[in-house]
Amino acid sequence: MSQQVIIFDTTLRDGEQALQASLSVKEKLQIALALERMGVDVMEVGFPVSSPGDFESVQTIALQVKNSRVCALARCVEKDIDVAAESLKVAEAFRIHTFIATSPMHIATKLRSTLDEVIERAIYMVKRARNYTDDVEFSCEDAGRTPIADLARVVEAAINAGATTINIPDTVGYTMPFEFAGIISGLYERVPNIDKAIISVHTHDDLGLAVGNSLAAVHAGARQVEGAMNGIGERAGNCSLEEVIMAIKVRKDILNVHTAINHQEIWRTSQLVSQICNMPIPANKAIVGSGAFAHSSGIHQDGVLKNRENYEIMTPESIGLNQIQLNLTSRSGRAAVKHRMDEMGYKESEYNLDNLYDAFLKLADKKGQVFDYDLEALAFIGKQQEEPEHFRLDYFSVQSGSNDIATAAVKLACGEEVKAEAANGNGPVDAVYQAINRITDYNVELVKYSLTAKGHGKDALGQVDIVANYNGRRFHGVGLATDIVESSAKAMVHVLNNIWRAAEVEKELQRKAQHNENNKETV
């Protein structure tokens, strides 16, 4: 009988470190709920002591997620563990994940300590975490470059202190698969109490070996794999969870293990992470790339038509990618749109049907037929822009040509007031942005601009994702339309609303702090 491999997702903690702009609490919650729907066993959602924003994100997700265990990261520092526990206490089930470096290089140059002192601190902090929960994970940072005898000492001590999961990270993506398998096997041979904990692995992709190392570790006895959707993460990224999950499913004959993942949710979750994080998926990305199931060779096409198994080791449907897509028109009713959303697996709580249907009709009038990918894009944009808006794009027009200076006129609703400005720019998009800056006086600096086609052909929707700098902080914005300039304008307005909302939150926090201070003085 096969054993289960626990899937530990760190998209919202380690994965977020790769992003140019931090995710909002709402965006993190969207991803967390998608991960829960996909069936991840554990989700690491933040580092609460690092900032009030991270604390709020962890607390919000802990309150909402019911079917996955919510985890927070903490260094082997008392305050870290106490704050992590405080942020997680509202959760249905939670885990505290604490870590300390164990390699000679890290101990000597980073910690300026000794192995004995590291072990002593690990024991104390694991015990402290156990005061809050029975589920404590301990990580040996840079385990891949830690001598096996030293690593075994640390692991044995952490298990004796109460750690229920021991994580072995290849922190810098240095280890080869056969080496990593040897580390796991070596721990099973050397640590007498290893049967009292689950052995986990956390690999990085600096040499392109993250997935290979994780699978080698599973083959050697590891029973938890940590990673991020689409492999996002610091430097070259984390282990791609979708790749490990499908490798375990497809090669069960070799690995003899399974996961509790709902495979049909993989593609949808991957797309959501890509959209929210503003990180396009390469076409040749394994499992979820747009070309993952494409066949261009005539010989391959002929073979697939005769029997898909000739050249496909898994089907698009196995990850939730349905190739037959129903098209809707402006004559399709609200019920038809809802029915299609139901068929694609969306719950009513995940989108506003009235808003979605209004956006659908406008799009159908422009392009005639609306496909599944159009509906998904509209639902995503609608969810992103549900929060209160101070700015709204009322009108814009542009004039440009090969020998002309681009000019834009923009009307922007700012609260109850509508303001208008015109400006020149280096192309129509820049002209629109210059006009918007004149209206608001925010003077945001564009850091990143990307355009993604949602669909196929000349009528495809264009999704514009931008990152803008304002007062030392980075804000993300997204816009969607059949017209690229309109998408660009909407993305900038989304940025402005995010800036405005952040300022409102700051005002509210200051108001509460002042209120608390006044109460103290009264007492």
Curated annotation (Swiss-Prot):
Signal peptide, first to last residue: none
Start and end residues of each stretch annotated as Regulatory domain: 392-523
Keywords for this protein: Amino-acid biosynthesis, Branched-chain amino acid biosynthesis, Cytoplasm, Leucine biosynthesis, Manganese, Metal-binding, Transferase
Enzyme class: transferase
SUPFAM superfamilies the UniProt entry points to: 2-isopropylmalate synthase LeuA, allosteric (dimerisation) domain, Aldolase
Catalyses which reaction(s): 3-methyl-2-oxobutanoate + acetyl-CoA + H2O = (2S)-2-isopropylmalate + CoA + H(+)
Binding annotation for Mn(2+): D14, H202, H204, N238
Alphabetical list of Pfam families matching this protein: HCS_D2, HMGL-like, LeuA_dimer
The Pyruvate carboxyltransferase domain, residue ranges: 5-267
Database matches in SMART domains: LeuA_dimer
Regions annotated as coiled coil: none
Keyword Manganese annotated: yes
Cofactor field: Mn(2+)
GO BP, one annotated term: L-leucine biosynthetic process
Pathway, per record: Amino-acid biosynthesis; L-leucine biosynthesis; L-leucine from 3-methyl-2-oxobutanoate: step 1/4
UniProt entry tagged with the keyword Transferase: yes
InterPro entries: 2-IPM_HCS-like, 2-isopropylmalate_synth_dimer, AIPM/Hcit_synth_CS, Aldolase_TIM, LeuA/HCS_post-cat, LeuA_allosteric_dom_sf, LeuA_bact_synth, PYR_CT
Family indicated by similarity: Belongs to the alpha-IPM synthase/homocitrate synthase family. LeuA type 1 subfamily.
Complexes and interactors: Homodimer.
Protein name in the entry: 2-isopropylmalate synthase
Taxon lineage: Bacteria, Pseudomonadati, Pseudomonadota, Gammaproteobacteria, Enterobacterales
Gene transcribed to yield this protein: leuA
